[in-house]
C-alpha cells in the first residue's frame, strides 16, 4: 500500500488544479501528504505564490529554489539542472512512496528525472495531450515515459499514452482537474471582486492571459504586440491581464503589459490572482483571450467564449466555445467581433467542455488508495 504521497508544484496555475486532490490526500488517515514547492512559486517576480499554499492550511515540506532572473534558453536549462539536483536531495530526505506530478512544465520534467534515478514511482496527471506550438509537448510525453501511473482527462489522451508504450492497465480516464476546481470553490460576487482587486468592470470585460509560444517562428513579444494593437480598439472594455509564465520571452511580455496598463485606464495587471479570484473573474467577464490552456480546459465550463491566439495550444481538444485566430491584429479584431456576436453566444450556451463535468480528484484519490507499490514499479513497453 502507498503511505507517503509527495505532490510537487512549480506554478500558481498548477497548484490551483492540484489543491482539491491535495486536500483529499491530507485528510486520508492512511496517507501522508508531502509537498514540494519550486519554480515560480518562490519567485518575487511571480508574487511568491507558495504563500497561497500555506494560506490554504498546507505545510510545505521542502522549498526548492531553482528560478534564474533571466528567462533565456541557457538560464532555463540551468533551472532544469537545479530542479533535478534539488528534487534528488529532497526525495532522499522525504523518502516518498509515490510522487504526483501534473502537466508539462520543465520544473516537472526535472522532478520526474530525479524520481527515475531514485526509483520512486510517479503518478502523472494530464498526460497524452497535444500542444504542438510549445516545447511543453515534448516535455509532457517525456514525463509520461518516466511515470508509472497515468491519470488522463480524455479518451484521446488515454489512447496517446498507450501509443507511447504504456500499459493500458496503468492508464486511467478521470477527466480534467480544472473542472473540479470550478465545481468546488465559492466564487466572489461582482462587487466583492471589484473591491478586492481595485478594478471597475465595464459593460464589456475581457480576461487576457498570453504566454510565449516557445516553438513559434515569430518572436513572442511580436505576437503579443499584435494582441495589444487589437485591444487598443476596445477602449470601452475592461481588460484584466494576468502574468505570463516563466518561459523564454515571458519577461518581455510582462514589461509590455506594464507599459500598456500605465497608459490605459481600462487595463489592470495582476501577478497572481489566486484560484478563487481567477475563477471569479472568468465568471464575470465576457470571455478570455490569449493562448493559455485555461481557455480550453476551464473556461468552457463557465459557458464563456475563448479566443485562442496562435499555435501554442495546437492539437489540444477544444469546445465549440473556442475561437482560433492567427497572432495578427486584424485576425484578433475579427475574433473579438465574433465573440460578441449573437450567433456565437448561442453556440457557447450549448457548448460542452470535453474535459468532463468534475470528480477527477476523487477518482484519482480512490485509485491511489488501492495502489500496490510492487505492481506499479515494474514497467515494460506495451506494443500495439
Where are these regions (language model features)?
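Nucleotide-activated sugar donor-binding and catalytic core shared by glycosyltransferases
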Residues: 1-384
Amino acid at each position: 500500500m502507498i503511505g507517503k504521497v509527495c505532490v510537487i508544484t512549480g506554478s500558481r496555475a498548477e497548484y490551483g488544479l492540484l489543491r482539491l486532490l491535495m486536500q483529499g490526500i491530507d485528510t486520508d488517515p492512511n496517507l501522508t501528504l508531502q509537498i514540494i514547492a519550486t519554480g515560480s512559486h518562490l519567485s518575487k517576480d511571480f508574487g511568491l505564490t507558495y504563500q497561497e499554499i500555506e494560506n490554504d492550511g498546507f505545510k510545505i515540506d521542502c522549498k526548492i529554489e531553482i528560478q534564474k532572473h533571466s528567462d533565456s534558453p541557457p538560464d532555463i536549462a540551468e533551472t532544469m539542472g537545479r530542479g533535478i539536483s534539488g528534487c534528488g536531495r529532497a526525495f532522499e530526505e522525504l523518502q516518498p512512496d509515490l510522487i504526483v506530478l501534473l502537466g508539462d512544465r520543465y520544473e516537472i520534467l526535472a522532478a520526474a528525472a530525479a524520481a527515475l534515478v531514485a526509483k520512486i514511482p510517479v503518478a502523472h496527471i494530464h498526460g497524452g495531450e497535444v500542444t504542438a506550438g510549445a516545447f511543453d509537448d515534448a516535455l509532457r510525453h517525456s514525463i509520461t515515459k518516466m511515470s508509472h501511473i497515468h491519470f488522463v482527462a480524455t479518451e484521446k489522451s488515454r489512447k496517446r499514452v498507450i501509443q507511447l508504450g504504456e500499459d493500458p492497465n496503468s492508464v486511467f480516464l478521470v477527466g480534467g482537474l480544472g473542472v473540479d476546481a470550478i465545481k468546488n470553490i465559492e466564487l466572489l460576487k461582482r462587487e466583492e471582486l471589484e473591491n478586492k482587486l481595485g478594478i471597475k468592470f465595464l459593460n464589456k470585460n475581457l480576461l487576457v492571459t498570453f504566454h510565449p509560444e516557445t516553438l513559434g517562428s515569430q518572436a513572442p513579444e511580436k505576437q503579443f504586440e499584435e494582441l495589444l494593437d487589437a485591444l487598443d480598439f476596445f477602449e470601452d472594455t475592461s481588460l484584466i491581464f494576468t502574468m505570463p509564465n516563466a518561459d523564454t520571452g515571458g519577461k518581455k511580455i510582462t514589461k509590455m503589459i506594464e507599459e500598456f496598463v500605465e497608459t490605459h485606464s481600462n487595463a489592470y495587471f495582476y501577478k497572481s490572482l489566486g484560484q478563487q479570484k481567477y475563477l471569479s473573474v472568468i465568471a464575470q467577464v465576457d470571455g478570455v483571450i490569449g493562448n493559455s490552456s485555461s481557455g480550453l480546459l476551464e473556461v468552457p465550463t463557465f459557458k464563456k467564449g475563448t479566443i485562442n491566439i496562435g499555435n501554442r495550444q495546437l492539437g489540444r481538444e477544444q469546445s465549440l466555445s473556442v475561437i482560433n485566430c492567427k497572432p495578427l491584429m486584424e485576425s484578433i479584431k475579427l475574433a473579438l467581433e465574433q465573440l460578441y456576436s449573437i450567433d456565437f453566444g448561442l453556440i457557447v450556451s450549448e457548448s460542452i467542455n470535453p474535459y468532463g463535468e468534475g470528480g477527477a480528484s476523487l477518482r484519482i484519490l480512490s485509485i491511489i488508495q488501492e495502489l500496490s507499490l510492487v505492481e506499479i514499479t515494474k514497467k515494460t513497453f506495451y506494443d500495439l
